[in-house]
């Protein structure tokens, strides 16, 4: 963790968010033949390496219901942070329990900026049809690709200010924590030791206060017991003096 830099880019964060949204919506997306369309008209046309990557059918009512579920944003933020970890982007857990870690910062960023309406709109954009039409004679079409997958969600996110704010915030958060751990490994260790030492000192103070309390209670009870013994001894002494006086 220390001594190595793990910079996260805006593009990488955008891809992670779009992939996470796509994965969260898997139950609403099904494969459907014939959704994309390639039309070739004429004679002598040559097509090489023409691909249709993904044919999709989207259940929009399922999408609407899914994004409005109470735990949707939480599940989405969990998947985004997990994807960041899987791509070896440093996610530092801070030693001080009172400080927000990256995961908390990312969750707050998503909840504020990545609205369910935006997510629903971007997922719904998957239902568009890709069309490739070639007309005439003697045309050569090579390396033509029709993509209808996470890239569409990614393009949609890049067209939204809220999504851009989310992506920028997550990218900066990851890089900020990564910079902290990589800038000076010994500073990180020193902070960790300081946090542990601080906790030990607090525990020691509590123990000392408990011991002082026990001593105070013991002293109070002991003094009270001696006082009671002295009060009981005074009548006995007086009676003894009276008896000696009578004998005399």
Swiss-Prot record:
Membrane topology term: Single-pass type II membrane protein
Q: Which residues lie on this side of the membrane: Extracellular?
A: 221-248
Q: Where is the lipid attached (N-myristoyl glycine)?
A: 2
| Presence of keyword GTP-binding | no
Q: Which UniProt keywords apply?
A: Capsid inner membrane protein, Host membrane, Lipoprotein, Membrane, Myristate, Signal-anchor, Transmembrane, Transmembrane helix, Virion
Q: List locations, semicolon-separated.
A: Host membrane; Virion membrane
Positions of transmembrane segments? 200-220
One cellular component term from this protein's GO annotations in UniProt: viral inner membrane
**What InterPro entries does the record point to?**
Virion_mem_poxvirus_L1 (IPR003472)
Q: What Pfam families would the database entry show?
A: L1R_F9L (PF02442)
Q: Which residues lie on this side of the membrane: Cytoplasmic?
A: 2-199
Q: Which domain of life is it from?
A: Viruses
Q: Could you tell me what this protein does?
A: Essential for viral fusion with host endosomal membrane and core release.
- State the family it belongs to: Belongs to the asfivirus E248R family.
- Subunit architecture: Interacts with A151R.
Q: What is this protein called?
A: Inner membrane protein pE248R
- Natural source organism: African swine fever virus (isolate Tick/South Africa/Pretoriuskop Pr4/1996) (ASFV)
Q: What is the lineage of its organism?
A: Viruses, Varidnaviria, Bamfordvirae, Nucleocytoviricota, Pokkesviricetes
């Amino acid at each position: 963790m220390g001594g190595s830099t793990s910079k996260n880019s805006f593009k990488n964060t955008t891809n992670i968010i779009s992939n996470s949204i796509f994965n969260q919506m898997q139950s609403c997306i099904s494969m459907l033949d014939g959704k994309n369309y390639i039309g070739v008209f004429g004679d002598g046309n040559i097509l090489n390496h023409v691909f249709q990557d993904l044919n999709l059918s989207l259940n929009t009512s399922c999408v609407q219901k899914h994004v409005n579920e109470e735990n949707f944003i939480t599940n989405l933020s969990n998947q985004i942070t997990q994807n960041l970890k899987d791509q070896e982007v440093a996610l530092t857990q801070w030693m001080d329990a009172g400080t927000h870690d990256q995961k908390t910062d990312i969750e707050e960023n998503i909840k504020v900026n990545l609205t369910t309406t935006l997510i629903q709109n971007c997922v719904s954009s998957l239902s568009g049809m890709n069309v490739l039409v070639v007309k005439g004679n003697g045309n050569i079409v090579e390396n033509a690709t029709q993509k209808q997958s996470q890239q569409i969600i990614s393009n949609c996110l890049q067209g939204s200010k809220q999504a851009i704010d989310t992506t920028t915030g997550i990218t900066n958060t990851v890089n900020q924590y990564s910079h902290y751990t990589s800038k000076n490994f010994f500073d990180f260790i020193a902070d960790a030791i300081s946090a542990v030492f601080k906790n030990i000192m607090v525990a020691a103070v509590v123990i000392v206060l408990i011991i002082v309390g026990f001593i105070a209670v013991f002293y109070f009870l002991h003094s009270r017991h001696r006082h009671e013994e002295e009060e009981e001894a005074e009548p006995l002494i007086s009676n003894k003096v009276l008896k000696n006086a009578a004998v005399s």
